[in-house]
A protein has these predicted regions:
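Conserved glycine-rich cofactor-binding loop
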Residues: 16-18
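Conserved glycine-rich Rossmann-like NAD(P)H-binding loop of the short-chain dehydrogenase/reductase
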Residues: 30-46
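Rossmann-fold cofactor-recognition segment
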Residues: 51-66
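Substrate-binding pocket helix/loop in short-chain dehydrogenase/reductase
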Residues: 92-93, 97-105, 194, 198
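Catalytic loop of short-chain dehydrogenase/reductase
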Residues: 101-105, 109, 113-114, 128-166, ...
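Conserved Rossmann-fold SDR core element
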Residues: 155, 164-180, 226-233
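C-terminal substrate-recognition "lid" of short-chain dehydrogenase/reductases
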Residues: 206-233, 238
């Protein structure tokens, strides 16, 4: 499978930082060409410099359908899609903040849905789509019912799209807590509480890494016999 991405074009929306950047980096190392998309031009520029000449950076906003349409028209034909980009807030039933309550679905679910819809006309029939859900689908946290439902919905979307879009392959990943860009930009006290919880409640006794999640995504891109599947790179968290 080491040559599966050789000279393939991989599109990563949310590719300037975090898991998305880790996927883009490994795709380049595997011989692929990557197009990274994000909203922040400065981060995009820096990521493209790091990735080198086999990368292209384009601005895109998954909350804007026209932005997505322009993004994919500019790219043209490509082979694989991964969309980890999302900005949301996790609140409980006691919250009256409608924007925060709906944000997981608006950003994480609908952002990926509309990205896929705009991408499909340009995506090779032998290619793949990998959606990003989360282990909260299998193991909800207190105060995170909507977030858990959103991740479950994304897993269901992946199975449904695998049927609708065949022979294009569609799979989903549901990672657990990852020691990476997202958590490192949160307050240290909250971050350490989350990491300690994960150390105590996962089978491997630690949070994951962005590199480990990227390996999972590249596996799904490269294995031509896997579709309609959901993988839990969560260190066994969902089993405890």
């Amino acid at each position: 499978m080491s040559e599966a991405l050789q000279d393939k074009t991989i599109v990563v929306i949310g590719g300037s930082t975090g898991i998305g950047f880790a996927v883009a980096k490994k795709a380049v190392e595997a011989g692929g060409k990557v197009v990274i998309g994000a909203r922040d031009p400065a981060r995009l520029e820096q990521a493209a410099i790091t990735l080198g000449e086999r990368s292209t950076a384009l601005e895109v906003d998954t909350s804007d359908i026209q932005s997505l349409a322009t993004f994919f028209r500019t790219i043209g034909a490509f082979d694989h899609l991964f969309v980890p980009a999302a900005t949301y807030t996790v609140v409980g039933l006691d919250s009256d903040d409608i924007e925060a309550i709906e944000s997981p679905f608006r950003s994480k679910f609908w952002g990926q849905y509309w990205a896929v819809k705009q991408a499909v006309p340009h995506l090779d029939k032998a290619g793949s789509i990998t959606l990003m859900a989360g282990a909260a689908s299998a193991r909800p946290i207190k105060g995170g019912a909507v977030y858990a439902a959103c991740n479950s919905a994304i897993e269901g979307l992946g199975r449904g799209l695998a049927i609708d879009l065949a022979p294009i392959r569609v799979n989903t990943i549901s990672p657990g807590t990852i020691d990476g860009h997202l958590w490192r930009n949160r307050p240290q006290e909250i971050r350490e509480m989350a990491y300690e919880h994960y150390r105590q409640n996962s089978l491997v006794g630690r949070p994951g890494t962005e590199s480990e999640i990227a390996d999972t995504v590249l596996y799904l891109m490269g294995n031509k016999f896997v579709t309609g599947s959901n993988l839990y790179p969560d260190g066994g968290y969902a089993l405890r």
